[in-house]
Regions:
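Acidic, metal/ion-coordinating pockets
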Residues: 1-3, 360
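Domain-core and long-helix interface of multi-subunit machines
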Residues: 4-58, 70, 147-351
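Low-complexity, compositionally biased segments
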Residues: 8-9, 84, 90, 168, ...
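A metal-dependent hydrolase metal-coordination microenvironment
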Residues: 39-195, 323, 329-388
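Low-complexity, serine/threonine/proline-enriched polar segments
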Residues: 134, 191, 204, 222, ...
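Repeat-unit-sized solenoid/scaffold elements
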Residues: 204, 307-311, 315-317, 355-373, ...
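Extended, intrinsically disordered, low-complexity segments
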Residues: 373-432
């Protein structure tokens, strides 16, 4: 058991080769019968797993191992503003023999479109939308990395301004954040990873715990001094000093009700939506809009009650289709059945590819999304295999990408296209 625990720890080691070595040793323990997979009763998939290259408790190696041992049939990496963890993710997937797909999540500027004044799917800022670049062909990763690098730099400039704002809010209480010493070390910036608001809040969480300890003193400070609203369930978790996920629960509370006080609007760090669509077309990747939907109760505890796209879905789908998006990604566990039925209906009306996007970035989230067992989501399982098939085909020849001009000429019906690429995903050698 000590060996197992040591190997699990090594999955998040600073050194990439150590992480991958741990995957190999753990898989050997599995094949020898010393480790069992979690039993599952369905072919579960997930295409939206964050790693330490944006924000997550999991390195790419650990994310793959968690996906494998949890019983996922496929796993997809989706980091914010970074493809730095992609090659490790692919290699780890090949070690444990799990099908993988790779992508990048980006915030885009919607100025000049009919959505520019809307609160779209971004809790912090109107006119800025979260979008996903799915199924990046492996030969296009370097181009994608070059594209996003200047935006990472601009984000760093804004991050420093937000750290200054935080210090102005908490400095009187003996707390001071240093961007270089406190924030960057909890990121993978040194290896091409992005630095996000979550990294800043994680660093702040460490400072708060160091200053006030865990439990009632800290809860009292948050409520009485910072005037942060904490829902009863999260207050109970933060009152428990033995809570193993304390840092992440504290981060969730801060993200829900503190960010708006120090937030600096994003501008230069967000490529224009036209640039993003152009990148997807040039690289043979799939441009997907990330549906959030109006939030009543946040599943992850990091979003307050807030309205997003649901009041203007006609306009939204008209505009994303006009702009060149080919897909919509959504999370079955995060929305109501009524919301999801509407989204599926709109995707069908506009012939948009539907992708499962269960956002994994905290240790409380399960890799298995039980909601996928509902018959209404059968298409998402097929879509995951189609994504994998697209990636395999496009990695050998961009003309073979799922939405290339050649594929557009070949397929009229979207379901025929999905079925074709699904067969490629499940049978790697028999395509085209």
């Amino acid at each position: 058991m000590n060996e197992l625990n040591e190997l699990i720890e090594q999955l998040n080691d600073y050194d990439k080769s150590t992480r991958l070595s741990a995957v190999k040793k753990l898989y050997r323990l599995y094949t020898d019968g010393n480790i069992k997979k979690q039993p599952v009763d369905y072919e579960y998939v997930n295409n939206h797993i964050h790693t330490t290259y944006s924000f997550s408790p999991y390195s790419p190696s650990k994310a793959v191992w968690m996906a494998f041992i949890s019983g996922l049939s496929t796993a997809g990496i989706m980091d914010h503003d970074s493809v730095g963890g992609v090659n490790e993710f692919i290699e780890a997937g090949s070690i444990v023999n799990i099908a993988t797909t790779v992508g990048m999540e980006v915030r885009v500027d919607m100025s000049g479109t009919r959505l520019e004044a809307k609160r779209i799917n971004n809790p912090d800022q109107a006119g800025i939308a979260y979008v996903a670049m799915h199924g990046i062909p492996h030969g296009q990763l370097e181009k994608t990395s070059r594209f996003i690098k200047p935006y990472q730099h601009e984000r760093g400039r804004r991050n420093k301004l937000m750290v200054e704002n935080i210090n102005a809010l908490v400095g009187d209480y003996g707390i001071k954040l240093d961007y270089e010493k406190d924030v960057l070390p909890v990121s993978m910036f040194h290896d091409g990873g992005s630095v996000t608001e979550r990294h800043i809040l994680y660093a702040l969480s460490k400072k708060l715990i160091s200053r006030f300890g865990k439990g009632k003193n800290l809860v009292g400070f948050l409520k009485d001094r910072l005037r942060i609203q904490i829902i009863p369930g999260l207050e109970q978790l933060l009152s428990d000093e033995r809570n193993p996920y304390y840092y992440y629960d504290l981060l969730g509370v801060l993200k829900s009700d503190f960010v708006e006080r120090f937030y600096v609007p994003a501008d230069k760090e967000c490529p224009h939506v036209i640039e993003f669509i152009g990148l997807c077309q040039e690289t043979g990747s799939i441009a997907a809009y990330a549906y959030l939907g109006d939030v009543d109760v946040s599943v992850t505890g990091d979003k307050k009650k807030q309205k997003f796209e649901d009041d203007y879905l006609d306009l939204l789908f008209e505009e994303i289709t006009r702009l060149g998006f080919k897909a919509v990604t959504y999370a079955p566990s995060r929305n109501t059945k009524e919301q999801l039925l509407r989204i599926k209906e709109y995707c069908g009306k506009y012939s948009l590819f539907q992708i499962s996007g269960e956002d994994i970035n905290t240790p409380r989230q399960e890799f298995i999304c039980k909601a996928l067992k509902d018959d209404m989501f059968e298409n998402l399982k097929d879509a995951a295999w189609a994504l994998i098939g697209h990636e395999k085909a496009a990695s050998s020849d961009l003309d073979k990408a799922m939405f290339s001009p050649a594929s557009d000429a070949k397929f009229v019906d979207l379901n025929d296209r999905i079925g074709y690429y699904k067969s490629i995903g499940k049978n790697a050698l028999s395509y085209m």
